[in-house]
Amino acid sequence: MPKLDLDAIPQTNATGYPPEFAGVVQGRWYRRLAPAAGLEDFGVSHVVLAPGAWSSQRHWHEGEDELVVMLAGEAVLVDDHGETVMRTGDVAAFAKNDGNGHVLQNRSDAPCTFVAIGRPADTACHYPDIDMHLFAGADGQKRKDGSEF
């Protein structure tokens, strides 16, 4: 069936971040829509950020394009160009390998909801503000020097 029942898709706030970097995403709740729909060529997540929560640590991907569509509420997009308020209906796109680290932060007093679309990639992910890096083909993040957390 093309229409997805969001309530039937498990919601989680799991993260692969090490504890020292995980606090800001504890209020991020997401559903992986692509597996539920049988989609294989790209990933889609339905994301709700509680007040104060971030979508991720600020990051950029070498081999993954990303697109975000705000469905409800308000978040602040923080990237190398500064800060941009994102409201219902706004769209942001992040081209792979552009070097522009980005994150959505919910600074409001109400939840916000968005859909994030990307492509599963086995390429590096850079985190410019913290000592963390996802190396291509690696199983989880490591410090920028390659050492384990």
Regions found by a protein language model. Name each.
Residues W29-R32, S45-H61, D98-G99:
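Conserved short histidine dyad/triad with adjacent acidic residue
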Residues G38, K96-T123:
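Ligand-binding loop in jelly-roll beta-barrel domains
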Residues A50-W54, E74, E83, D98-N100, ...:
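Short, charged/polar surface micro-motifs in flexible loops or helix N-caps
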Residues D80-K96:
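Short acidic-glycine-tyrosine-enriched beta hairpin
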